[in-house]
């Protein structure tokens, strides 16, 4: 934001500052609508409002970053490059967290919105091993849109490494089952034969986890449908409905 302010006052931004007003209005609207359940139910659970406020703050910083560093001729290429870097970083920290490194788990949980205590230490905690202020369903949709964007970009430019598909599927799986189910649509729409090794690697990983570690609480929740297919119907996690 400081860099952007400097560029603006030095008149290095003759085209002005781009602000996606529609997206800004949507986030503010979500904050406003989140107040209604509090008023109706008389509760003091501000976790949802806190999440959207964090999103608003991050969105504003994101707009600032875009205008400061990406609003130029090569901006699109730079955005895609940094998104790829972000995917690699998220994959790395997510795996470290899943392996049980306490320092990484503490760091990842600190980046999330504050959620009800029942989620911490539960079979769903793995879904919080993401560097984000968003939780669960919204996070799955975010990763879904990110996958769709990167695949669409690659369909046109064909410059992204195929391993990126594997990494995206892995971090998307951490976010929840919504991503796992809906990502199939994006992959089918923008399918390339060179994605096949990454897709096979991911499928093998999922099958191995579901077959050999069905009792692991994180695996049981994330891969419940696959476990049911492999081990027979009737196996359910304690949080199937969520």
Give the location of each predicted region:
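Transmembrane signal-anchor hairpin modules in multi-pass inner-membrane enzymes, especially those
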Residues: 1-36, 74-81, 153-157
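Hydrophobic cores of alpha-helical transmembrane segments in multi-pass inner/ER membrane proteins
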Residues: 2-4, 57-67, 140-150
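Transmembrane helix-loop junctions and nearby membrane-interface residues
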Residues: 5-12, 35-42, 95-105
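Aromatic-anchored transmembrane helix interface
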Residues: 23-34, 44-68, 82, 87
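Hydrophobic alpha-helical membrane-interfacial segments at the cytosolic entry of transmembrane helices
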Residues: 25-29, 82-92, 194-216
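Alpha-helical transmembrane segments of multi-pass inner-membrane proteins
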Residues: 80-108, 129-175, 180-192
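Juxtamembrane membrane-water interface segments that cap and precede transmembrane helices
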Residues: 114-131, 241-242
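Membrane-interface loop/short-helix elements at transmembrane-helix boundaries
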Residues: 124, 221-242
């Amino acid at each position: 934001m400081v860099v952007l302010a400097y560029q603006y006052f030095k008149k290095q931004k003759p085209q002005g500052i781009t602000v996606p007003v529609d997206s800004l209005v949507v986030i503010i609207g979500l904050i406003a609508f989140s107040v209604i359940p509090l008023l109706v139910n008389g509760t003091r659970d501000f976790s949802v409002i806190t999440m959207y406020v964090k999103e608003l703050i991050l969105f504003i910083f994101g707009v600032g970053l875009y205008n400061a560093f990406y609003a130029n001729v090569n901006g699109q290429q730079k955005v895609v490059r940094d998104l790829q870097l972000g995917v690699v970083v998220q994959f790395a920290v997510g795996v470290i967290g899943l392996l049980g490194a306490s320092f990484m788990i503490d760091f990842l949980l600190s980046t999330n919105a504050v959620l009800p205590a029942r989620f911490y230490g539960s079979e769903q905690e793995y879904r919080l091993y993401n560097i984000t202020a968003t939780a669960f369903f919204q996070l799955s949709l975010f990763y879904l849109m990110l996958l769709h964007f990167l695949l669409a970009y690659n369909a046109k430019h064909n410059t992204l490494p195929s391993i990126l598909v594997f990494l995206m599927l892995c971090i998307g799986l951490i976010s929840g089952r919504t991503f796992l189910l809906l990502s199939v649509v994006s992959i089918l729409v923008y399918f390339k034969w060179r994605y096949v090794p990454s897709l096979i690697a991911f499928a093998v990983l999922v099958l191995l986890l579901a077959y050999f570690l069905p009792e692991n609480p994180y695996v049981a929740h994330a891969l419940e449908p696959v476990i049911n297919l492999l081990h027979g119907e009737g196996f359910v996690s304690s949080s199937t409905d969520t």
